[in-house]
Amino acid sequence: MENRWQVMIVWQVDRMRIRTWNSLVKHHMYVSRRAKGWFYRHHYESRHPKVSSEVHIPLEDDSKLVIITYWGLHTGERDWHLGHGVSIEWRQKRYRTQVDPDLADQLIHLRYFDCFSESAIRNAILGHRVSPRCNYQAGHNKVGSLQYLALTALITPKKIKPPLPSVRKLVEDRWNNPQKTKGHRGSHTMNGH
């Protein structure tokens, strides 16, 4: 019998991002209790040698989101791709599919966190009381309408310390982004001074 390959998307991330993600998940599971029902599986509980951790996040209707972090993978093209990665799966019974970080954040947002959403505009106009803030800003991936922006400017969201774990933040590529210069003078080395 020949080998059967299964291809899956694994986002390359650095080791420190995975450590930060795991500590945020554990904090909100055990200390702040904002992540009720989440399940954390350690590397020694997994049968796969490359799995470093798993986070199971239950959603609606028997479905769940599973974020698996890996170690010991082949290194990437860049020096900082040291063989660490993340896969994001949506599971319902025996069906599994992979999702991107934005969709994962939206699914978490819809299920777990209070939101000052688009429906708040209509309720505020009608004079109903609305939830004044969104506790999970990572779940919003688009710019809202002008009314929504006006309401959010009027009522500023409260910052939660430590922040809630965001899948998009976990897999973002901060290495390939150009570095921002500070101040109005710009970078001295680039200006030739």
From Swiss-Prot:
Keywords: AIDS, Host cell membrane, Host cytoplasm, Host membrane, Host-virus interaction, Membrane, Metal-binding, Phosphoprotein, RNA-binding, Ubl conjugation, Ubl conjugation pathway, Virion, Zinc. One of its GO terms (biological process) is viral life cycle. Signal peptide: none annotated. It is found in: Host cytoplasm; Host cell membrane; Virion. Residues 40-44 are annotated as: Interaction with host APOBEC3G. Residues 152-181 are annotated as: SOCS box-like. The keyword Repeat does not apply. Processed in virion by the viral protease. A motif (BC-box-like motif) lies at residues 145-154. Residues 76-115 are annotated as: RNA-binding. Induction: Expressed late during infection in a Rev-dependent manner. It is a peripheral membrane protein. The modification Phosphoserine is found at residues 145, 166. A motif (HCCH motif) lies at residues 109-140. GO terms for cellular component: host cell cytoplasm; host cell plasma membrane; membrane; virion component. Residues 14-17, 75-80 are annotated as: Interaction with host APOBEC3F. Residues 172-173 are annotated as: Membrane association. The modification Phosphothreonine is found at residues 97, 156, 189. The BC-like-box motif mediates the interaction with elongin BC complex. Counteracts the innate antiviral activity of host APOBEC3F and APOBEC3G by promoting their ubiquitination and degradation. Acts as a substrate recognition component of an E3 ubiquitin-protein ligase complex: mechanistically, Vif hijacks a host cullin-5-RING E3 ubiquitin-protein ligase complex (ECS complex) and the transcription coactivator CBFB/CBF-beta to form an active E3 ubiquitin-protein ligase complex that targets APOBEC3G and APOBEC3F for polyubiquitination, leading to their degradation by the proteasome. Vif-defective viruses show catastrophic failure in reverse transcription due to APOBEC-induced mutations that initiate a DNA base repair pathway and compromise the structural integrity of the ssDNA. In the absence of Vif, the virion is morphologically abnormal. HIV-1 lineages are divided in three main groups, M (for Major), O (for Outlier), and N (for New, or Non-M, Non-O). The vast majority of strains found worldwide belong to the group M. Group O seems to be endemic to and largely confined to Cameroon and neighboring countries in West Central Africa, where these viruses represent a small minority of HIV-1 strains. The group N is represented by a limited number of isolates from Cameroonian persons. The group M is further subdivided in 9 clades or subtypes (A to D, F to H, J and K). Belongs to the primate lentivirus group Vif protein family. This is Virion infectivity factor. The gene is vif.
